[in-house]
Amino acid sequence: MSSPRPEPQADTQATIAANRARYEALKQAGDGVTPRHLPPPTARDGAPIAEECIRHKETVPGGWYWTKLIRRGEALRIVNTSATPGVSVFAWNAHDTSERYNSADTVKIQWTSELRKGRVLFSDMGRVLFSIIEDTCCAHDAIVGGSTPASNARAYGDASLRSTAENMLLAAGKHGFGRRDIAPVISFFSPVSIIDGRPQWRDGLVAPGDFVDLRAELDLLVAVSNCPHPLAPGSDYTPGPIECVVYRAPPSTADDICRTASAEAQRGFENNDLYLEA
């Protein structure tokens, strides 16, 4: 029989109390700054890209992956031409690949798992990697993660089908990285909500032609996996093609909604500024 856990020492209790007080103060500050309404979804026929601004365009077949260097000030548009249920993305700082996208911090720092136009994606060092500058469906998932051989076996009865876990490992290998360099991904076009403490898929929110635009706030190595989300409905593995477009984005301004949407986003951009000045 195990011994009862000892009570925390007084100094430990004081540290816990101080950390909780700081957490509550930060949350209150964030709640006070975050606007009541983020921008509405982008129209599917809106936000056209001028041809002269496009640096690269490529179609990624269903089940496959894509990786590219995206420079600060450029944006990646992912066009879901066939309403594939889920496209996963991961990113590394191109100049210090120990810094990478962090789903947990992205959700925690912004006090929300609703990542949509006006929000940002954080690294594990508190800097902003991507800003979501256009978004037609506003239905994305940073909680569940990408597909694996095990999730494919459960959903489709075949663990050999291509998965995001395997695609990310292949993409990482293109840059000399390994499994330890990959963390949980964000899945776009994946309408997942937490209901009664469990993640659930909400049907009918993704349509052909939906797109999301991610502006790079640092030079990034980016990996994209075109595999269905683990919770995607249906028993047939039929991911359709997507289109990845890298283009020169309009420059960010001081009142950019992604920069000003919350106190946490402002701090993230300030961290970027300090890093870029060094």
Q: What are the functions of these language-model segments?
A:
Residues 2-278:
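Acidic, Ser/Thr/Pro
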